[in-house]
Structure formats: C-alpha cells, structure tokens
Amino acid sequence: RIQSDLIRAALEDADMKNEKNILSSIMGSLGTIGNVVGNVCCSITKSCCASWLFPRLE
C-alpha cells in the first residue's frame, strides 16, 4: 500500500509539473508575440514605441 501511495504521489507531482510547463510555454509564447508586434509597430511609427502597450521597447 505504501508503494502504491508513493507511485500515486509521484504521478500527481509529474502532472502538476506538466501543467506548469504548459502554462510557462504559453506565457513565453505570448511574450514573444508581444515583442514581435511591438517591433513591427515601432518600425511603422515611433509613437507606438513610447506607448503603454510596449513599455519594454522605449
């Protein structure tokens, strides 16, 4: 019984790590997309670079 509890706990831990990895991946992709959009916007007009939407590009 102890062994099955340990296995179950390990599987639950692995599932939680996968969920965290998926969320981290999604957030990283959104950040990358935001940077690309910001760079395109800045190449079109410099007023976009100073906007609150893309503060990292100032």
Curated annotation (Swiss-Prot):
Cell location: Secreted
Any GO molecular function: toxin activity
Tissue localization of expression: Expressed by the venom duct.
Domain of life assignment: Eukaryota
PTM notes: Contains 2 disulfide bonds that can be either 'C1-C3, C2-C4' or 'C1-C4, C2-C3', since these disulfide connectivities have been observed for conotoxins with cysteine framework V (for examples, see AC P0DQQ7 and AC P81755).
Residue span(s) of the pro-peptide: 1-20
UniProt key word Secreted: yes
Spans traversing the lipid bilayer: none
Keywords of this entry: Disulfide bond, Neurotoxin, Secreted, Toxin
Major location (coarse): secreted
Signal sequence region: none
A single GO cellular-component term on record: extracellular region
Protein family membership: Belongs to the conotoxin T superfamily.
Notes on the domains: The cysteine framework is V (CC-CC).
Listed name of the protein: Conotoxin Ar5.4
Species name: Conus arenatus (Sand-dusted cone)
Phylogenetic lineage: Eukaryota, Metazoa, Spiralia, Lophotrochozoa, Mollusca
